[in-house]
Every structure is written in structure tokens, then in C-alpha cells.
Amino acid sequence: SDLDRQQCNNCGVVWGIYAPDCDEYTEISPDSIPLIGRPFLLGSHDCWGLVMDWHATQGVALNDFRVDYPWWESQYPDNLYFDNWEREGFVECAPAPGCMVIMQVESDKWNHAGIITDEGELLHHLYGQPSCITPYARGYFKDRTMICVRHKDLPQEIKPWRA
């Protein structure tokens, strides 16, 4: 299933899957998931997962605070981006390629993030949609940006990351 494949990719190890009702066994190996066009799965392939994976292409490892429930809704106390950006080693900065922008989209909390590309666009993974690159300089996402930050270990020169 898609969920098995995504969890296999998250673990980074080969999975053995057995279906006892038909006595079938198969193994799946982790794939390298492209940053653009990946399907959305909350707690796995979501906006923080994309930010983590993009930073990994630059040699920066981030902690995984993804959860599989809609933490940005008012019934949950979590405020994951607001609570973790500094703790993760990000510092506030002016927008530039490689910076992460944290946005507030249809919520009372900072609930979405993306990376500014070399072309000044936004690499992001919006809830329920495939990850994509969107214009950023003005418009919807720029208007919802709460803060622009850059990881302290991110080099000034961004390594190529598009497949």
C-alpha cells in the first residue's frame, strides 16, 4: 500500500510484507522520494517532512517533530513551528534562497513552512496536495508569512537539489 511504502521510506530499511490470507510474501526497499510531486501524508510526507528532506540535501540534519494528527486545530495545544524553530537552530533573517518561511494558513497557529528557492519561489507541501514550487514574491503565501529563518549550519551557497 502507499502507507507501507511511505513508512518504509521513512525508516530507510527494507520491509518484508506477508499476507497470510493468500500466503504471499514480498519485500520493498526504501525509495528516494523526489522533493517535488510527493503525495501528502500527515506525519510523514508533509511540510515539515519536506523541510527536513530539503535540509538533508544541504547536509543539515533536523529533528523530526512530525505528528499524525492536525495539531494546528484549536482543540490541540501544540504549536509546533512556533515552539521549535529556534530550538532547531534557525535564526531570523531576510528572505533569501535556502531560507525557511513559516506561515499561518487558515489557522490561529503558525502551521505551514516552505523553502525559498534560488529563483525566489516557494518549495512547500500544502495539506492534501502534492509538494510543489509556487510563486512567492507577492500573493497568498507571502501575505501569510509570519517569519523568515535560516538554519545556522546552512551554507550560504545552496547545493543543487532538483532531481
Provide a role label for each language-model segment.
Residues 1-29, 34-36:
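Active-site-proximal loop/helix of nucleotide/amide-processing enzymes and allied scaffolds
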Residues 36-41, 107:
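A short glycine/serine-rich beta->alpha loop
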Residues 41-58:
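Active-site nucleophilic cysteine motif
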Residues 61:
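Extracytoplasmic copper-binding redox domains, predominantly the cupredoxin/blue-copper superfamily
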Residues 67-137:
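...with weaker cross-activation on analogous glycine-rich loops/strands in unrelated enzymes
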Residues 135-163:
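Glycine- and charge-enriched low-complexity intrinsically disordered segments
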